[in-house]
Amino acid sequence: MVPKLFTSQICLLLLLGLMGVEGSLHARPPQFTRAQWFAIQHISLNPPRCTIAMRAINNYRWRCKNQNTFLRTTFANVVNVCGNQSIRCPHNRTLNNCHRSRFRVPLLHCDLINPGAQNISNCTYADRPGRRFYVVACDNRDPRDSPRYPVVPVHLDTTI
């Protein structure tokens, strides 16, 4: 019985360690506020092809992000969406700070097509342009954010 207990404790520690590593892969780089990281990941008026556009994000994350959506609009326009009625976030149902855009915007959705890439310089993406509504989570600004916007987008929850 002792070996089984010992083995199960090691398995638990390994699992917790892996969860910590995976969680850190999704974390924003510490030098950015949540709003700044949102802008880097999701705002681009004229994004280049996905494989090129994703390099900046992947360089901060040190891995190939599976998918990403660039909204072809301005940060100020997304901030204005934060003023729309609050709704429960469709993909993260524990959050009630989401807001749906009133208008469709052009966007570029990127899907990783070589998930086994060992080096971030080899990440390759398929481009899926579109025009959709979007839902963002918004929070009060971080003291490091511009005081121009008291409430800022921090998470792209979904596109519709």
Swiss-Prot record:
The record marks 60 as: May be involved in LPS-binding. The active site is at residues 42, 155. InterPro entries: RNaseA, RNaseA-like_dom_sf, RNaseA_AS, RNaseA_domain. SMART domains: RNAse_Pc (SM00092). Substrate binds at residues 65-69. CDD domains: RNase_A_canonical. It is found in: Secreted. One of its GO terms (biological process) is RNA catabolic process. Keywords: Antibiotic, Antimicrobial, Disulfide bond, Endonuclease, Glycoprotein, Hydrolase, Nitration, Nuclease, Secreted, Signal. GO terms for molecular function: endonuclease activity; lipopolysaccharide binding; nucleic acid binding; RNA nuclease activity. Residues 1-27 form the signal peptide. GO terms for cellular component: azurophil granule lumen; extracellular region; extracellular space. Disulfide bonds join 50-110, 64-123, 82-138, 89-98. Glycans are attached at residues 84, 92, 119. Residues 28-72 are annotated as: Required for nearly all of the bactericidal activity. The modification 3'-nitrotyrosine is found at residue 60. Its EC number is 3.1.27.-. It is an enzyme of class 3 (hydrolase). Belongs to the pancreatic ribonuclease family. Cytotoxin and helminthotoxin with low-efficiency ribonuclease activity. Possesses a wide variety of biological activities. Exhibits antibacterial activity, including cytoplasmic membrane depolarization of preferentially Gram-negative, but also Gram-positive strains. Promotes E.coli outer membrane detachment, alteration of the overall cell shape and partial loss of cell content. Interacts with bacterial lipopolysaccharide (LPS) and lipoteichoic acid (LTA). In vitro interacts with and insert into lipid bilayers composed of dioleoyl phosphatidylcholine and dioleoyl phosphatidylglycerol. In vitro, tends to form amyloid-like aggregates at pH 3, but not at pH 5, nor 7. This is Eosinophil cationic protein. It comes from Homo sapiens.
